[in-house]
From Swiss-Prot:
Gene3D superfamilies: Ribosomal protein S20
Function: Binds directly to 16S ribosomal RNA.
Assigned keywords, A-Z: Ribonucleoprotein, Ribosomal protein, RNA-binding, rRNA-binding
Superkingdom in the source lineage: Bacteria
Any one GO biological process: translation
Gene that specifies this protein: rpsT
Family as reported in the entry's similarity comment: Belongs to the bacterial ribosomal protein bS20 family.
Residues covered by region (Disordered): 1-25
Name of this protein: Small ribosomal subunit protein bS20
Organism: Burkholderia multivorans (strain ATCC 17616 / 249)
Cellular component per GO, a single term: small ribosomal subunit
InterPro entries in UniProt: Ribosomal_bS20 (IPR002583), Ribosomal_bS20_sf (IPR036510)
Pfam families: Ribosomal_S20p (PF01649)
């Protein structure tokens, strides 16, 4: 347990940041899963719509450094390829 006032405050701040960042990471994963689900279902219009929303979410979370920018870019690239593959198959 933290003994000094400064250490107690830092512990409170760390817990608050961890809670907030966990929620954002969850939002990141949920956005990716939603696009994947639409692609697997073969719903081209919904996949494109969800992809656009997912890109916005992914970029926001990468800007806040919740996930690394390279991981964000890789996720967007893979989702784009999946959506494009769905359009090519149609």
């Amino acid at each position: 347990m933290a003994n000094s006032a400064q250490a107690r405050k830092r512990a409170r701040q760390a817990a608050k940041a961890n809670s907030h960042n966990s929620a954002l990471r969850s939002k990141f994963r949920t956005a990716i899963k939603a696009v994947r689900k639409a692609v697997d279902a073969g719903d081209q219009a919904k996949a494109a719509e969800l992809f656009k929303a997912a890109v916005k979410t992914i970029d926001t979370i990468a800007d806040k450094k919740i996930v690394h920018k390279n991981k964000a870019a890789r996720s967007k690239s893979r989702l784009a390829a999946a959506v494009k593959g769905l359009q090519a198959a149609a």
